């Protein structure tokens, strides 16, 4: 295998998201979408599948030594994620938004080596926003260097999260308890956009001060997690401990706000 730089991997990811952008926008504007249900409210479209297939074919043809961990190609929740160079792909994060022509959704591509994210490329086609990062190389939005916010107090902060797919009584009670804990501490605003990857990207450029969620997958947060750390933020477990991307939970943001939020958020109870 030739000596491939992180910048070369990144450029390949950028090229492929820009290549498929027009097709995504065309399908986004169409009122006729082929929709399947992975669960009661969890959607997948023909566009999700076509985008992932194109990304996989393009990147593995150019880099045959790389593996794939993709949302639509991963079955039964088994993460085939080892030490080999692995592309972690979410073809459309925010599929429900995409289906309803709500403009917040994105394509997310990360490269993991030894299970560490070293390349991040996240593209929001409607907004034409391209977030990029390499390990140790900083984070960028449309080529301009970005950083997380410097807000110190919760009363001045915007917190972002999502309601997720758990609509059981216990799941709703857990969600509302955390909302109450946060709002009681007088955060300035609480936001829900329906796309974890884009919300975390918004953290990386300082639009949002912190994001948390339970129920996410590695492909939802892989690229955005590198954006945040390269922009000076932290990505942790909601308790404040080390983040495990396979644990399906995350808290991230500027260190001041993350530290305060970790003391307010309760842990989700395990299902019986």
Swiss-Prot record:
Keyword ATP-binding found: no
Domain of life: Eukaryota
Pfam families: Inositol_P
Residues engaged in binding Mg(2+) 2: 90, 93, 220
GO biological process: inositol biosynthetic process; inositol metabolic process; phosphatidylinositol biosynthetic process; phosphatidylinositol phosphate biosynthetic process; response to lithium ion; signal transduction
Residues the record lists as binding Mg(2+) 1: 71, 90, 92
Enzyme Commission number: 3.1.3.25, 3.1.3.94
Family: Belongs to the inositol monophosphatase superfamily.
Function recorded in the entry: Responsible for the provision of inositol required for synthesis of phosphatidylinositol and polyphosphoinositides. Has broad substrate specificity and can use myo-inositol monophosphates, myo-inositol 1,3-diphosphate, myo-inositol 1,4-diphosphate, scyllo-inositol-phosphate, D-galactose 1-phosphate, glucose-1-phosphate, glucose-6-phosphate, fructose-1-phosphate, beta-glycerophosphate, and 2'-AMP as substrates.
The name this protein goes by in its record: Inositol monophosphatase
Originating organism: Dictyostelium discoideum
